[in-house]
């Protein structure tokens, strides 16, 4: 009887999966953490070639799983995974902060190039306030900012932080971001949940001096929130003024506030919250348009007693204020309890978020977990949820101009040359499939293949499994993922 019941549940889940519309636009990302060598490089001091080989292997795995973006930590602790005039080389590359890779190369330029080759977006992940990861054992270079400006920093627990209350700190962070978006072809600037640090029981964050100087007329909590507001506004202005195409996203802790603290809060019992403990008023940032997307870290399982995934998913849908909402999934928790031993946990989370029109995708923490194919989730993504490619959803407030449609030249029965001659820059061509007799567009045609190209591409029909009673179409796709009109291919 139990076997029959289990089979019925499995069939029901399978039916539910295939009954859903497969999205042509869906963010599918993975966090790649470099701090403490969590994901990449696997250890410090590896030769440059080995570092590159490891990153290529990571990208290939995620591309196979259907991902279209990676979120890579490029500034773990006031250091850099790239040559910088402002901050030293990261110790997580070579084992010693300030020491360049050997043989020399630019890891960030390399990672961006390899990511874009695969038609994926590269989101540069920065930590705004962490300066020294561990004051007892971290390598700190002589030219590190903590030694140039020791008056900017505060020790809390075993870490050293920028003091968020200092205007000079905000200016320094803006300089770092401006340099990054000026020199590199990144697609977004991304920051996670670490604004003010998570509270340590019995210890107050030691910012009394800066509060006394700058906090006039505000409570300390209000002042701290205003400091986070100020850095977000300043960074958004910096990005817009430097390269308006680049997106700005935040990945906050999953609970903004509990309902017991605020009528707008969620039906949760979070021990710490964004608003009250990290001083990050995410809702204000969304309302004001200071950020382009939000990725709440909903790392709990469905049915969690204190922070239910289902409850929080609906809550964030209600409060995304027209900006893009992607959901952060805690796949690193695979196998940690019964809920995370259940192979349906992540598939069900994806199915549920797809039932909300305002949720536009997923980001998974962390990259290395996928190398183990936990609970067969790689197989589920490849064969079901992400079987077909998807484009990162475009952001019309940044750019809503579609590129010109491509032209087609037939070479043989199975080969076509696709050309683009428009003024708008493009990054790829999309091949779509649609039923005969249907006026094809991106809402009713299925994206089946992406060809990374800026001018010309060859379409080989023999490599595509075309169905009967369907026609193929091609379209141009620009840097903001706007799609041209579809042109009949075959």
Model-flagged regions — what are they?
Residues 462-483:
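Beta-strand-rich modules
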Residues 67, 118, 147-290, 299:
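Polysaccharide-binding and catalytic clefts of secreted carbohydrate-active enzymes
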Residues 279-305, 321-397:
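Substrate-binding cleft of secreted/luminal carbohydrate-active enzymes
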Residues 22-29, 67-78, 107-154, 190-193, ...:
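Glycine-rich, aromatic-flanked loop segments that form ligand/cofactor-binding clefts
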Residues 65-102, 201:
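Aromatic-lined carbohydrate-binding/catalytic grooves of carbohydrate-active enzymes
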């Amino acid at each position: 009887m139990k076997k029959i019941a289990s089979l019925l549940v499995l069939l029901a889940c399978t039916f539910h999966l295939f009954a859903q519309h497969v999205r042509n636009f869906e963010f599918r990302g993975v966090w790649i953490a470099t701090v403490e060598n969590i994901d990449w490089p696997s250890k410090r001091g590896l030769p440059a070639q080995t570092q590159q080989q490891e990153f290529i292997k990571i990208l290939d795995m995620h591309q196979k799983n259907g991902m279209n973006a990676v979120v890579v930590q490029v500034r773990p602790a006031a250091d850099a995974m790239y040559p910088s005039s402002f901050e030293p080389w990261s110790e997580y590359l070579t084992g010693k902060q300030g020491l360049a890779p050997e043989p020399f190369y630019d890891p960030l330029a390399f990672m961006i190039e390899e990511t874009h080759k695969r038609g994926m977006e590269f989101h540069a992940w920065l930590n705004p306030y962490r300066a020294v990861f561990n004051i007892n054992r971290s390598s700190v270079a002589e030219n590190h900012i903590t030694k140039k400006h020791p008056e900017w920093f505060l020790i809390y627990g075993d870490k050293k932080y920028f003091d968020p209350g200092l205007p000079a700190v905000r200016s320094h962070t803006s300089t770092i971001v401006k340099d990054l978006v000026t020199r590199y072809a990144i697609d977004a600037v991304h920051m996670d949940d670490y604004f003010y640090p998570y509270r340590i029981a019995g210890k107050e964050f030691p910012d009394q001096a800066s509060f006394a100087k700058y906090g006039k007329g505000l409570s300390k909590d209000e002042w701290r929130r205003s400091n986070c507001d100020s850095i977000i506004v300043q960074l958004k202005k910096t990005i817009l003024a430097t390269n308006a195409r680049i997106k700005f996203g935040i990945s906050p802790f999953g609970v903004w506030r509990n309902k017991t603290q605020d009528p707008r809060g969620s039906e949760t019992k979070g021990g710490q919250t964004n608003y009250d403990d990290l001083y990050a008023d995410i809702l204000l940032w969304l309302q004001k348009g200071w950020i382009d997307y939000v990725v709440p870290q909903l790392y709990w399982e469905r049915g969690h007693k204190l922070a239910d995934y289902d409850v929080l998913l609906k809550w964030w849908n209600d409060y995304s204020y027209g900006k893009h909402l992607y959901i952060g999934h805690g796949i690193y928790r695979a196998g940690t309890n019964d809920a995370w031993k259940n192979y349906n946990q992540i598939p069900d989370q994806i199915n549920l978020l797809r039932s909300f029109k305002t949720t536009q995708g997923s980001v998974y923490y962390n990259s290395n977990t996928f190398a183990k194919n936990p609970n067969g989730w790689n197989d589920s993504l490849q064969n079901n949820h992400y079987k077909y490619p998807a484009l990162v959803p475009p952001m019309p407030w940044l750019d809503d101009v579609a590129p010109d449609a491509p032209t087609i030249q037939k070479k043989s029965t199975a080969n076509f040359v696709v050309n683009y001659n428009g003024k708008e820059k493009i990054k790829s061509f999309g091949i779509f499939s649609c039923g005969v007799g249907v006026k094809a567009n991106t809402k009713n045609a299925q994206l089946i293949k992406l060809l990374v190209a800026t001018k010309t591409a060859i379409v080989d029909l023999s490599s595509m499994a075309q169905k009967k009673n369907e026609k193929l179409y091609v379209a141009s796709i620009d840097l903001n993922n706007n799609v041209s009109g579809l042109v009949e291919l075959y």
